[in-house]
Amino acid sequence: MTTRAQAPVGVFDSGLGGLSVLRAIRAELPAESLLYLADSRHAPYGEKSPEYIADRTLRVCEWLVDQGCKALVIACNTATAQAVHVLREKLAVPVIGVEPGLKPAVATSKSRVVGVLATESTLRSEKFARLLAGASGDCKVLSQPGYGLVPLIERGDTHSPAVLELLRAYLQPMLDANADTLVLGCTHYPFLEDAIHEIAGDRLTLIDTGHAVARHLGRTLAAAGLQASGQAATPCFMSTGDVLPLQAMVAALLGEAPMAQRVDIGDAPLSPVAVSLASQPE
């Protein structure tokens, strides 16, 4: 076991949604130490330009590598869709992304109608278009941008009248079309499971890919000889914005009361590399 194998895995999201992925990683890979970074100062990413997302994601992930992370999990569907090819081109550590769980949804659906709730940026990306073309099969796929949901979740609001009103508007057309499976295509959306069940009852099977991502990470670390052993260190939590929402969400989700640290990962003009790579397919 090398010293490098005991280094942390960096888990990155534009905000707090990636905590759902961190929870899955801790369950699947309890020996791995984790460093979670929320780029909350710049959230949400979902309605920003592809060039901005690629550049900002690269900047943040370079910072995580500088902190000693042995691998990175991009726990953000939007950042994965727009920037994972940038990261794999530029960084010397394994990079694991997330994508909407369309394949398991298609395998699960009995009505052959599947809903996808994701950010506008994810749904417009070439990566999602390829996924849709390759995985939808004989299913009808209804894609819906989740406008307004991420800012509410970032404030810890997962079940208010405002949240329920938005969800009803987004889900009712899917239910009317006889959808029986819903892909949670943003890592924030697992926090809305209770609210979704209140609206849809048991009519929708929810597909959350957090555990699949964790298992993929485990296989990648094993192949690279980077699996940790022994007792994991307590996770470190960092944010480029206000740390209080992060601390509150960790307490609610993980039952812990960490002291999150605020970090500054400065802005800069869009780099030519990121602008060029953002327009390339993965």
Swiss-Prot record:
Domain of life, per lineage: Bacteria
Binding site for substrate: 13-14, 45-46, 77-78, 187-188
Keywords associated with the record: Cell shape, Cell wall biogenesis/degradation, Isomerase, Peptidoglycan synthesis
Reaction(s) this enzyme catalyzes, per UniProt: L-glutamate = D-glutamate
Gene Ontology BP terms: cell wall organization; peptidoglycan biosynthetic process; regulation of cell shape
Biological or metabolic pathway of the protein: Cell wall biogenesis; peptidoglycan biosynthesis
EC number of the protein: 5.1.1.3
Pfam families: Asp_Glu_race (PF01177)
Broadest EC class assigned to this enzyme: isomerase
GO molecular function, one term: glutamate racemase activity
Function comment: Provides the (R)-glutamate required for cell wall biosynthesis.
HAMAP family membership: Glu_racemase (MF_00258)
Family per similarity comment: Belongs to the aspartate/glutamate racemases family.
This protein's name: Glutamate racemase
Organism: Ralstonia pickettii (strain 12J)
Recorded name of the encoding gene: murI
